[in-house]
Every structure is written in structure tokens, then in C-alpha cells.
Amino acid sequence: KVLKYKVMIDPLTQKLDSEQYNWLMRYGYIDASINTNIIKLKETKEMLWSHIKKGHKHNIKQGRKYCKVAVWDYSNPDYEKHELYRLMHHKVSGRITRSLKTFELQYDWLKNDEAILIGLFFDNKWIAFGCFVHLNKKAIYSSSVQNPEELDISVPLGHLMIWTAIEYYNNREFDLLEIG
């Protein structure tokens, strides 16, 4: 006898703006939808920029003023930078939060054009990293880390990482980016 059955519908596989987003409810399933943000990337950069809130635009501009931004993908994988990303996770959390194997998988995805790593450099040190995974012209903001001990600036860096990913995926003509 089945007491519980869980089914997930990935929001990136559905038609956006559709009334039929959770068709399982017609069969008695409970709607336990996630709350997420999905960016449609099939617009010009100018149009994408126009959708961003004023405060976020300010944060992006401030981040660019202070930080050098780097993107690593299949064309320029850098194991050393990926290791810095992994070690920063360990340092910031104060413990090992996930196995080495998961980081090795992320690096393999990077080499196989299934992910990118974004890094922010300030005052001669890497201060933040963000990992985005992708498949079939759709991308997901997967993981990020910022080292507050290294920050001599009070600028939210997440907005700059997300905007960098938007630009990257827009240039590659991706359809969607889920940012959580």
C-alpha cells in the first residue's frame, strides 16, 4: 500500500505564464509549488537591464567599480580557481559541508560545457564565487560563496554575479536562467 508519493515538475521544463503549470492537481495531488525567479534571456541586454530594480542596478555598478569579474567555462577551465571556490566554502562555513566528489562533479560539468564559475577579485584576492549549471539552453544559479573576512567593501556581490551570468547566457543565446 502506497502512503505517500512525491512528484516534482521542474519549472524550467514548463511553459512560462501557463495556467497549466501544475497539472497534477487535476488528479488530486497537493500543490506544493516552489517559489522561484526565472529570467527570460531572449531579449536584448538593454531590455534585460531595464527589468532590474534601481537598487540592484546600483549594487551591480558598485560591484563593477570595485571588483574584477572573471568567468570560467568549458573554453578556459581553471582547476586552481575551482579549488579556491571549494576551499572558500569550507572556510566560510567552518566545516566541510559536502563531499569533495560534489566539487569534482562541478568541475567536470565546467569542462564539459554544463556549468560556469564566476569569480570576483578585489584587493589582490578572490572574495566571491558563484556556480551556474546549464543544459538545453536553460541555466540554474547553483551555488555561491563570499568570504566576509576578505571584504573591505560594503557592496552586495550576489547581484553582480547574477548579472554577469545573465550577460554570459544571453550572449550564448540561452532561453532561461533560474535564480531561485
PLM-predicted stretches and their roles:
Residues N76-Y79, L120, M161, I166, ...:
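Structured catalytic/translocation cores of nucleotide/phosphate-coupled proteins
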Residues V2-L12, Y169-G180:
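Conserved GNAT acetyl-CoA-binding A-motif
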Residues K1, D152-E167:
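Conserved acetyl-CoA-binding loop-helix of GNAT-fold acetyltransferases
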Residues A32-S33, A165-Y169:
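A short, hydrophobic secondary-structure junction motif
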Residues D10-I153:
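A conserved beta-strand-loop-helix scaffold within acyl/acetyltransferase catalytic domains
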